[in-house]
Amino acid sequence: ALRIQPKSSTAFSGLTQAQSLLIQKKIKAQLSNAALQETKEQWHLAANNYKNILAENNSLIEAQLGQKRSKKREHLSDAINIVLATPLRLSSIGVYEHAKELLESAKKVQLPGPGHTEQINQLVKELEMAKTLLLVAFRSDNSTKVTLLKNSMLGTFKEKKLLLKPGNYIATGSREGYRDVRIEFKVTPKEGPFSIEIACREPI
């Protein structure tokens, strides 16, 4: 119609209305898709979908609330996954307390999906294991002074046993006239028994 009558207000109005209907249809489909992604606990995808919708129309309350909701769940889920991916970091008091706070926040989520419930169960399990003391046997030559960094001075001994929490550890040994030694090891509930041999044997 505009090609025939370029100045026709009726034709222009019709074209504008058609474009508006197309945009509304697109936004409706995006909202439906974002809601489905929330149901599937696909928080990153849902948040991005709501972001795209708001780029088209930033006044849509439904999209604003959806983006806020998805972003909140996205951040919580990501934070929990970071803890679950590196459980030995729970040996740090700060990390442990942060994980407990995440757990409390996770428990407050209403209508949690199966993925969220699994995250809670796994986080509870890791927090419990982080407090489990595991037996570690240290063996030396009765001449090397052994130190467990950030833990204690073990001194000289043939064998010594300690109860340690899961985590990453470093043991060092020193002996006059010999090269110092350093051993890094990790203690986890999924491994063991733990036996660490440390002694200075290389003369200087």
Language-model segment annotations:
Residues 4-5, 13, 17, 39-55, ...:
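Short loop/turn and low-complexity linker motifs enriched in small/turn-promoting residues
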Residues 24-25, 77:
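Residue signature of alpha-solenoid helical repeat architecture, marking inter-repeat boundaries
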